[in-house]
Amino acid sequence: MRRLKTFALLAAFTVSATLHASANCPNVPEAQWMHILDMQKKIVNEYGFAIKKFQTDGHCYEIYGWGLSADGKKFEKIEVYFNPVTGEIVKKNVEE
């Protein structure tokens, strides 16, 4: 039983690390990053996302919020990682 718990814990850490590692942002000094307000403006004006929470995650900017679905008919909850230097989307997760 103890072995099973250890295995489950190890698997959870591995999955968590893999999911986090998939947002590959460049490792550059924060002095080269876009200013937070400029990044937020880009997210709203260029991508059309509504921001609920904005934060830094590792070497990425990350938001939780809402965006239009692919067909443009409804809003979806999203989690998006951005390159902090260029503002490009690195990874986008849509809650189903």
Predicted regions and their residues:
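Alpha-helix termination/capping residues and helix-transition junctions
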Residues: G48, N83-T86
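Short, low-complexity, Pro/Ser/Thr/Gly-rich segments in the mature regions of secreted, periplasmic
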Residues: V85-E96
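Short, non-transmembrane alpha-helical segments in secretory-pathway proteins
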Residues: N24-I51
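Sterically constrained small-residue positions within well-ordered secondary structures
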Residues: A12-T14, K42-N45, F54, D71-K73
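Exposed beta-strand-loop-beta-strand "reactive/processing" segments of non-cytosolic proteins
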Residues: A50-V80, E95
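Classic N-terminal secretory signal peptides
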Residues: M1-S22
